[in-house]
Amino acid sequence: MYTSGYAHRDSSFSSAASKIARVSTENTTAGLISEVVYREDQPMMTQLLLLPLLQQLGQQSRWQLWLTPQQKLSREWVQASGLPLTKVMQISQLSPCHTVESMVRALRTGNYSVVIGWLADDLTAEEHAELVDAANEGNAMGFIMRPVSASSHATRQLSGLKIHSNLYH
């Protein structure tokens, strides 16, 4: 999982996570948009990273909005995750072409502490700017969830450093 280059060009995930936590606890007037790319075969990693933040945001008086393409949140999962059942709203069966527009409208209202939407395609620069403006206006956070399959993840070149040493040869 990583946060988008749009949202955090010069920072690591840990500093981005601490910034998110600081923003949510200080209730500053800045909004935040972040893209979360995760492997479809490892959804627990995403839950482990996002749940503490969502639990903290659940303590605010505002709603949490989930814009899901097909999945329906289970009442049992919401409760077991420690999220406030009375503050979680979901709109499912939303067409991907309406997700960004719906996120912008929801973020702008200020009624939601967080708006989470699923998109398969990358955002355009214009869409990203619209989301950032809306999040700032509504003092809210928005997460673009982008699943990737394990097979497409495996075909990309891995980033890393090879250290060649003649000490071991």
UniProtKB/Swiss-Prot annotation:
Gene that this sequence comes from: sulA
Record InterPro entries: Cell_div_suppressor_SulA, P-loop_NTPase, SulA_CellDiv_inhibitor, SulA_enterobact
Stated family: Belongs to the SulA family.
Alphabetical list of SUPFAM superfamilies matching this protein: P-loop containing nucleoside triphosphate hydrolases (SSF52540)
Known function: Component of the SOS system and an inhibitor of cell division. Accumulation of SulA causes rapid cessation of cell division and the appearance of long, non-septate filaments. In the presence of GTP, binds a polymerization-competent form of FtsZ in a 1:1 ratio, thus inhibiting FtsZ polymerization and therefore preventing it from participating in the assembly of the Z ring. This mechanism prevents the premature segregation of damaged DNA to daughter cells during cell division.
Organism: Escherichia coli O127:H6 (strain E2348/69 / EPEC)
Subunit and partners: Interacts with FtsZ.
Processing and modification events after translation: Is rapidly cleaved and degraded by the Lon protease once DNA damage is repaired.
PANTHER family listed in its UniProt record: BLR3025 PROTEIN-RELATED, CELL DIVISION INHIBITOR SULA
Site (Essential for degradation by Lon protease): 169
Keyword line: Cell cycle, Cell division, DNA damage, Septation, SOS response
GO-annotated biological processes: division septum assembly; DNA repair; negative regulation of cell division; SOS response
Region (FtsZ binding): 106-112
Induction: By DNA damage, as part of the SOS response.
Official protein name in the record: Cell division inhibitor SulA
Region annotation Lon protease binding: where it falls in the sequence: 162-169
